[in-house]
């Protein structure tokens, strides 16, 4: 017996620590990996993030440090918290379909380093005169028949000085589009207070004038128009009672700190913009930025787009966040993540100014596949009665609650 025990011990030593000796059996080579450690606890949300998620209204005194703190939250936590807030202010499955038409192409005197419509760059684009009122209204009718509830018009020039005839035609376009019960937005460069008042009288819903990027990075992108001139145009628009549409372009060679700076600027305006477009650079050969980017390389990683959308939602809870240029590079799954995190509008149709757009049929198929519905005209974000609904045990519970809310205000989910 002693000899047998000694033999077993010797055998165990010879086989090493990786071998298991079973009583009354031959040794077997069972290798046991180290016991897995307990998963790390989920990151604790900062007090800034907690306060943002529990917001009862809009806030205009964000500090840059606070926005940076939100932006740098671990991405899964950031997207979850922005989705939670989004459902308190918006119908989660309602996405606005917008169509953008170029009513005057090319020939712009500015040097925006991303833009094909600048006369300074050789991009192969042919400048055109302004489209006729009738052709624009026909395009708006087609957009409406395909489900768009917002029709946007863009003209490539620096400002409206000396353009009395053009302004008159634009006002006729605005009046005609509004008669179709569509929201109408224009982007016409810089405008003064009198021009803003004229557009307001014509029934303009919103005026788009993007800030593009942070104040710090802006001089690297544009030299012919200052950041303060852009802010001045937004001030004229607000004072005229027109909704402000202002966002940025990601992929201009900026850093995450510039995303923070852009959001800080728009979220501390006297009023939050009615809508915040998030563009991803579409590189166009012949432009300075288009020539810098290697062929086939994505100008901005998707996680930066998602972080920007989520941070914008948490700091501007009632604002419509629009996925604009560059959506053709996103998969359906990426778009759905954006919608979940707080984006609730897309540009759809044949073209988006000079770049390709996701077509109406493609978007309709995506909406049907994922249970999305077109947002109604003039639907806006506001704090909704979600008492007890955020604690729902499943997505079905959340959707049922939102559907009841939609019926209560005469909307379809």
Predicted regions, residues:
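Auxiliary Fe-S-binding modules of radical SAM enzymes
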Residues: 2-20, 24, 28-75, 79-80, ...
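Functionally engaged cysteine thiol sites
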Residues: 18, 108, 112, 152, ...
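N-terminal pre-triad scaffold of radical SAM enzymes
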Residues: 72, 77-122, 128-154
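Mobile, glycine- and charge-enriched loop segments
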Residues: 93-101, 109, 113-122, 171-178, ...
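Hydrophobic faces of well-ordered beta-strands that scaffold small-molecule active sites
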Residues: 95-101, 151-153, 184-186, 207-209, ...
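Conserved short loop/turn motifs at secondary-structure junctions
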Residues: 100-103, 158, 186-188, 250-252, ...
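Short glycine/proline- and charge-enriched loop/turn segments
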Residues: 116-118, 216, 290-295
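Conserved Radical SAM active-site core
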Residues: 119-247, 251-268
């Amino acid at each position: 017996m002693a000899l047998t025990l000694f033999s077993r011990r010797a055998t165990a030593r010879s086989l090493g620590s990786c071998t298991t000796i079973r009583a009354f059996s031959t040794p077997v080579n069972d290798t046991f990996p180290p016991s897995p450690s307990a998963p790390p606890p989920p990151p604790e949300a900062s007090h800034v993030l907690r306060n943002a998620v529990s917001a009862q209204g809009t806030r205009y005194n964000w500090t840059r440090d606070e926005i940076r703190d939100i932006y740098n939250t671990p991405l899964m936590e950031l997207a979850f918290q922005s989705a939670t807030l989004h459902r308190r202010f918006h119908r989660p499955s309602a996405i606005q379909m917008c169509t953008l038409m170029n009513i005057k192409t090319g020939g712009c005197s500015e040097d925006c380093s991303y833009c094909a419509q600048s006369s300074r760059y050789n991009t192969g684009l042919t400048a055109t005169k302004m489209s006729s009122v009738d052709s624009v209204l026909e395009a708006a009718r087609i957009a409406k028949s395909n489900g768009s509830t917002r029709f946007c018009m863009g003209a490539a020039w620096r400002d409206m000085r000396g353009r009395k005839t053009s302004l008159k035609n634009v006002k006729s376009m605005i009046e005609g589009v509004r008669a179709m019960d569509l929201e109408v937005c224009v982007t016409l460069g810089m405008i003064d207070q009198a021009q803003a008042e004229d557009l307001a009288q014509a029934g303009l819903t919103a005026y788009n004038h993007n800030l593009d990027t942070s104040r710090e990075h802006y001089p690297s992108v544009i030299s012919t128009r200052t950041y303060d001139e852009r802010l001045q145009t937004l001030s004229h628009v607000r004072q005229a009672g027109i909704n402000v549409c202002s966002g940025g372009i990601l992929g201009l060679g900026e850093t995450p700190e510039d995303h923070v700076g852009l959001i800080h600027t728009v979220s501390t305006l006297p009023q939050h913009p009615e809508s915040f477009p998030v563009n991803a650079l579409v590189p166009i050969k012949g432009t300075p930025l288009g020539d810098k980017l290697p062929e086939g390389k994505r100008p901005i990683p998707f996680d930066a787009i998602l972080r920007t959308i989520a941070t914008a939602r948490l700091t501007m809870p009632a604002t419509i966040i629009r996925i604009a240029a560059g959506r053709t590079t996103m998969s359906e799954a990426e778009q759905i993540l954006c919608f979940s995190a707080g984006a609730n509008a897309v540009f759809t149709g044949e073209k988006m100014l000079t770049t390709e757009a996701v077509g109406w049929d493609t978007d309709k198929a995506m909406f049907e596949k994922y249970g999305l519905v077109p947002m109604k005209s003039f639907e806006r974000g506001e704090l909704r009665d979600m008492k007890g609904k955020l604690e729902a045990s499943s997505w079905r519970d959340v959707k049922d609650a939102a559907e009841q809310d939609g019926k209560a205000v005469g909307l379809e989910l």
